[in-house]
Amino acid sequence: MEERFYQFLRGHHVLHLATLGEQGLWCAPLFYALDEERIEFVVASDPKTRHTQGALQEPRIAGSVALETKSVGLIQGLQFEGIWKSEDPKARELYFKTFPLARALFPVLWRIEILHAKLTDNRLGFGKKLEFFRENHSL
């Protein structure tokens, strides 16, 4: 993934997740820690929530991270498609390093493996988009 993607994502901490499960479409904002090495988000979410249930039923998910601005010339945002996965020790370590106070809440953590991402950055020119495609991935 190109450095500009990481620069943008390092400046934010909330993604908007979209899922599709037996209850239909749903979306939710989630705090994220960014695993740059594995090109993944690490998020906390209760397994009973509608969006987590949807992701467990259909692990292909989508989402976005956006800069809120009223200036068209400053618009920046990332759209992504990914795979919802269980957490692992590396993900736990990263999440609690990013959000140390969350440890006391004993959250259930998940990983989102980014398969495809599109970064819009109007500072580079109106409608300028950069794309990332993961070559190898696993469900």
Swiss-Prot record:
Q: Which InterPro entries match?
A: Split_barrel_FMN-bd, UPF0306
Sorted alphabetically, which SUPFAM superfamilies does this protein's record hold?
FMN-binding split barrel (SSF50475)
| Superkingdom of origin organism | Bacteria
Member of which family? Belongs to the UPF0306 family.
Identification of the protein by name: UPF0306 protein WS0399
The organism named in the record is Wolinella succinogenes (strain ATCC 29543 / DSM 1740 / CCUG 13145 / JCM 31913 / LMG 7466 / NCTC 11488 / FDC 602W)
